[in-house]
Amino acid sequence: MADRRDHRIIDGKAVQQRLLAGIRAELEAAAETHPVGRLVSISIGPSPEIEVYVRNQARAAATAGLPFEQVVWEASATQEACKRKIAALNDDPSVLGIILQRPVPAHIHVRSLQSAIHPLKDVEGMNPASIGNIVYNDIALAPCTAAAAVEMVRATGLPLPGLEVVMIGHSEIVGKPVAFLLMAEGATVTVCHHMTRSVAMHSRRADVVIVAVGKAHLIGPEMIKPGAAVIDIGINQVTDAAGKVRILGDVDTEAVREVAGWITPVPGGVGPVTVAMLMRNALTAHRRQVAAGWLEAAKA
């Protein structure tokens, strides 16, 4: 297991606490002129897997000073019923932001529900409008995991303008947004995927390698330039020979740390910062709702 005292390890929990402290201070200042609403977490049907994420989000919200409400809708709820409930939350001025927990039941079209969340309450950055805005360098309400990956790059102290970055993985919610976020900051980004002829050819020249594929230990030390930063977004459940389930990233951390200048552990790396980005998006949402005049009635 990675030793977080190693200077090469970027401790996501420490980054999270630093971010949340700053967010709390800014929210307290914002609340002096306009009341800050609550975050509403929506789960469709019970799920032990979701409960872990909800607890982490609730804990971070408490640290940031944000009211947090968890609601669980029936697993049998129809698509239209869910959209009506989301519309009601959109219209409720006491609701700052809406979080749609995943996975959802098979009969629910998750993208349709994400599209139903008003962009100014889309604290996850998952509404198509929010993702599309990134193309125009409006990066303040970005998908949380993508924003967290960029924040981890910042934690290295490497200047983003001109930085050579290789993004391995091109999903709609991580890989592609990461590429656009970094390009908005002036980085030179190469995106690799399953049809890339030689991922290693690209990764070995990169100052930063970011990985989000979902394949345990895909990246070894032979694929990394000495001194490069390695940001591991992958989360994989692997059963070892003793029958014990372990959480592994897409990077062989123990081997790669001997080559890398910086590396994120799994767990405890990008994950905690993703939750902090959710709270930062909530702060941004509040400011934009104030600017749009949504909160004037609540202020009065």
Curated annotation (Swiss-Prot):
NADP(+) binds at residues 169-171, 235. Its EC number is 1.5.1.5, 3.5.4.9. Pathway: One-carbon metabolism; tetrahydrofolate interconversion. It catalyses: (6R)-5,10-methylene-5,6,7,8-tetrahydrofolate + NADP(+) = (6R)-5,10-methenyltetrahydrofolate + NADPH; (6R)-5,10-methenyltetrahydrofolate + H2O = (6R)-10-formyltetrahydrofolate + H(+). One of its GO terms (molecular function) is methenyltetrahydrofolate cyclohydrolase activity. Keywords: Amino-acid biosynthesis, Histidine biosynthesis, Hydrolase, Methionine biosynthesis, Multifunctional enzyme, NADP, One-carbon metabolism, Oxidoreductase, Purine biosynthesis. One of its GO terms (cellular component) is cytosol. It holds the Pfam family THF_DHG_CYH. SUPFAM superfamilies: Aminoacid dehydrogenase-like, N-terminal domain (SSF53223), NAD(P)-binding Rossmann-fold domains (SSF51735). GO terms for biological process: L-histidine biosynthetic process; methionine biosynthetic process; purine nucleotide biosynthetic process; tetrahydrofolate interconversion. Catalyzes the oxidation of 5,10-methylenetetrahydrofolate to 5,10-methenyltetrahydrofolate and then the hydrolysis of 5,10-methenyltetrahydrofolate to 10-formyltetrahydrofolate. Belongs to the tetrahydrofolate dehydrogenase/cyclohydrolase family. Homodimer. This is Bifunctional protein FolD. It comes from Rhodobacter capsulatus (strain ATCC BAA-309 / NBRC 16581 / SB1003). The lineage of its organism: Bacteria, Pseudomonadati, Pseudomonadota, Alphaproteobacteria, Rhodobacterales.
